[in-house]
Amino acid sequence: MIRLLFSFLLVLSVLTAPQRAIASSEFIEILNKNAALIQKSSSKTVAPVLEEIQSYGTRLAADFLIGWKNKELFFIKESSRIIRVDSTGKNEDGKKIVNISDAVTDEKLGIRLSKDVKQIKPNSGVRAKIASALVPVLLASEDIQDRQEGLDTLSRDIKSSHLEPLKNAIAAERNEDLKTRMEQAYIYASITHGENEDEIENAIFSLR
């Protein structure tokens, strides 16, 4: 039985590995196309990039957005490749060095001089836009702080695309206080963006 299970898992890993590679390749193409705006953008220019990344819709995209928002991403100056810095130090000549890996695939890229890479530092306006794009992911997180952040972000700028993930979050929420806040946000979101007249009417009456 154990041997059979091992064989199944081995076959499954072989079948899914190419799919992951294809997914990474497709996502990297999106990032390469938008590299300049990712490296330096404003709240006025970042929207199209976020829409394209968000529409990709996988955990890969969500992890990238989280890293971008938290200023955890860097890029290699000569190639514009987006990376993460795993550790820092100094070489034998006393020069600052960084140990880096690819931001999407986690491929280890070795050691570079610190001056060869640059941190991506989105300003507060861009980070707010990224947070809004992350709302569905944050609301579905197992971490209550993530869910609170998702709700806070949503409450500042409720969009029609937030209705479905908010509804799902309400059904799954275990914290009563947070669930009440979600329900209140859903009522206002339904009034603002709802397309079903009965749901809008029920939302209005629930305020009385």
Model-identified regions with their sequence ranges:
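Extended repeat-based scaffolds of very large eukaryotic assembly and lipid-transport proteins
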Residues: 23-208
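Sec/Tat signal peptide C-region and signal peptidase I cleavage site
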Residues: 17-23
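N-terminal secretory signal peptides that target proteins for export/translocation
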Residues: 1-2
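Bacterial N-terminal signal peptides
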Residues: 6-17
